[in-house]
Amino acid sequence: MPKWYDNYLSIYGKSIGEVPDCILDEIKSKLAQQQSDEPLVSIVVIAYNEEKRLAACLWSLSELQTTYPIEILGVNNNSKDRTEQVYQRVGLPYFNEAKQSPGFARQCGLENARGKYYFCIDADTFYPPRYIDLMMTKLSKPDVACVSSFWSFFPDKTHSSFGLFLFEMVRDAFLFVQHFKRPELCVRGMVFAFKTNLARKVKIRTDILRGEDGSLALSLKPYGKIAFLYHRDARPVTGYGTIGSQSLWQSFVQHVKIQGKGITRIFFKKDHYEDSDENLVKPQR
């Protein structure tokens, strides 16, 4: 059965020289049509060494079906491959951020965004056509500061559709229970959107390697709810960056071991988390 992301998957993992010019031209044309002179929503892609995945992501963004005026921007986060050339080839406005970390990249995007609402986009992820409008049903509410969604993985030779279904079902159930008291722990950058002015007020953490998304969500809690959207049509599809070379079973066991330690914590609210030394950004020389 065809999937909505099959076209994007056909160029996923290919270098810019391997993607047909006709597809790159199509992406360029559609991206240009999406751009508004007065955007209400800023959609910002961050990319570090994503030459082989970025074009597929941008293809999905070029086919968004939204009623909101939007801008789509890119951030090249000190890439050593041809990520920047992908941005150039499809004509997407982008910014170079030399300081390395997702926090620096997202902060760069935030500083340059013009929209009232800000959508975080990861370059290795495909976004469904109605993603923006469905997320906005939550984010546009006055008592909501930010919103997140669930996400899926695409099946491949080592990850079956059935295995992914079971893995995601268990994971989603855990996240659903956790979000009542610890919603900030359920937020992932690839499926995260917030009100721009509030994020600029609290700022995005740039001193940590991971978790800048959840940290930002925690900082936004005094200004409004952390909302979650449970809708199949608002579920992006991504690769295996969070699983790596592990099998689904290995990843599942690892998650159970990690989450099983102090599992009762998910039933109690928390307003502050201590940083671990290994997650701190080391000073660049």
Language-model region placement:
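N-proximal low-complexity "stem/linker" segments adjacent to membrane-targeting elements
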Residues: 1-60
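Short, acidic, metal-binding catalytic loop of nucleotide-sugar glycosyltransferases
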Residues: 59-69
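A conserved acidic beta->alpha catalytic loop
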Residues: 60, 76-84, 125
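Glycine-rich, basic loop-to-helix element that forms the pyrophosphate-binding segment
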Residues: 97-113
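Short aromatic/hydrophobic "clamp" motif used to bind/position activated sugar donors
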Residues: 118
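Conserved donor NDP-sugar-binding/catalytic core segment of glycosyltransferases
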Residues: 130-161
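Short, flexible, basic/aromatic active-site loop/helix in glycosyltransferases
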Residues: 149-155, 163-185, 189
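Acidic donor-binding loop at a coil-to-helix junction in glycosyltransferase catalytic cores
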Residues: 209-216
